[in-house]
Amino acid sequence: MISVELPLKRTKLVQAYHRWFADKPLASDSYKLVYHYHCKHLGPLKGVTRERKFTKLLDISIDEDKLMAAFGKTTRYEVRRAGNSDELQFGLVSNWETFLKYYNGFAALKEMPEMDPTILRSYWPHCVVTEACFEGQPLVMHTYVVDPVASRINLTYSATHFRGEVDRELRRKQGRANCWLHHQDMLHFKREGYACYDFGGYAFETTDKSLQAVNEFKDSFGGELVEESNYTSRALGWLRWVKSLR
């Protein structure tokens, strides 16, 4: 399990926490501002509110050829073509401000909220950011929350910049780069000794077409669909309720 301490804007007397990959919340967590991600326990618990969480998990400890063989035919083709023809370079992003700038540029294109730099700084010791570059410029970045003890990595953010919306070939190259980067990430973390690659979520039984497309993309890498639990502590739920009244 990892625990991320989040500073509150209005007071330093109380801290909020995000905890990841615990079996289940501690009883004492109900009196703290705690949100638990990806717990193994599947039932209700006293002092916390449960939310069902689905995700796709891949065993990356297996042989590399078997890992690739589990991919769908199209995904294998995209990964191989990108690796053989697209002149991509794999890299790690060591500076959180570099990722923040890239992600916020992506968010602006998608009309999404910008990332909070305070939260990113708190998470950074538990994050690994990878990139696929072409001619020295990043086409795709992936951010992972990593837990060495659990031997698990969780895809938290994926960001892509479309340089020139009319350039269809570049769009196709970026699509291949995204597939390729997922594969390179798996190989990188495998070499680092991790065993479980977590796609970060799965929109179970969704009727939303765009979310269905995301599910299909994740399905194309194989893996197992699993149910887990996110839990909100009683204290955090109460605080959110108070804020909703304002």
Where are these regions (language model features)?
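C-terminal catalytic domain of photolyase/cryptochrome flavoproteins
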Residues: 198-246
